[in-house]
Amino acid sequence: MNITKLTPWFLFSCLILLSDYIKVNSSISPSSEQTQEDGFFGFKPTKLFVFGDSYADTGNTPFLIVPSWRFPNGITFPGIPTGRFSDGRVSTDYLAKYIGVRTPITYKWGKYGRPRLAVKRGMNFAYGGAGAFETMFKLVPTASVQIDSFEQLLMRNVYSPADLNSSVAFFSIIGNDYLTYDRRNGSEEGRSALTRKVVKQILLDVKRIKDLGVRKVLVALSPPQKCLPKLVTPKGCDTNDTSTYLHNSLLRKGLIKLNDKEINNNDKSFMTLDLYNAFVTIFKNKGVSGVSTFPDPFKACCATKRGTFCGDRSLSGKKLYTLCDDPKSFFFWDNVHISDQGWRSVFSLLLPDSQF
């Protein structure tokens, strides 16, 4: 079946059925053994709010403008495309599972405050292609605009102060600002200034989320940008990328300062999710116990040529991608995004008490 020819109404109907499927499927919801009483955050969150890009997006980005709604995305879970840029789950799903809540509803479906039960679990505002500033993906809201949407819900009393006090926010702006800079032929000399500008905006954004009442904010550090399949050279990947190092260094220092300004700075309001060290550990693993091993960690399961994406087809319907036989043996799903098994490995490293 050529899914690109399906009508929007048919796809909408599929999504409604999918939402019911996810509600009853145990693999996306927490088990009693995985529920954390205190755990990573020091308290038991009951809600998760998510802001960011395609590493966290669970279906906000419109299916008319991105290939994440096309086969083979979603083949591992739940079996059909859900708008995730992966064969299955993404970072948001695994974080929600660790916390002990169901994956939060996307803003696209929950922005009207309904269904109430689903909205009460939190909400995902992340869009694929988003950045700290406007990126080359013109129709995608920046992180600041995503927070605007969150604030509008608060003004409508969709969430109470008590709701927010039992919540965690996940902020994942990884690299679209830098990708846009490269596409526009930005100079290497100007990259440092851009990095400082991006990090400054991220710090403003996460502080704003905290000021709106969210109890804690988890901020993703950037993984090694030059290790993406689309950028890896025959010599391998550059894990000592100075640009990524500067981004993470400035972000860490900025978050420390924000924590120091908190009234109760023993209860750290701003935390980091160290994707950089998790990725590097997995890339360099040669069989260390407890760390997943991938035969070729820099190779994409859904491989494409320059200018095409996983799920793309020609006008005649010919596939413009090559699909691997076993997605579980690949860390990367496509040239940029992580596979379900890849994300499982990352969170197993970062949250060692978890059972994914």
From Swiss-Prot:
Major location (coarse): secreted
Q: Its family?
A: Belongs to the 'GDSL' lipolytic enzyme family.
Q: Which SUPFAM superfamilies match?
A: SGNH hydrolase
Q: Which organism is it from?
A: Arabidopsis thaliana (Mouse-ear cress)
Q: Which UniProt keywords apply?
A: Glycoprotein, Hydrolase, Lipid degradation, Lipid metabolism, Secreted, Signal
Check the record and name the CDD domains matching this protein.
SGNH_plant_lipase_like (cd01837)
- Indicate what this protein is called per its UniProt record: GDSL esterase/lipase At2g36325
Q: Does the keyword Hydrolase apply?
A: yes
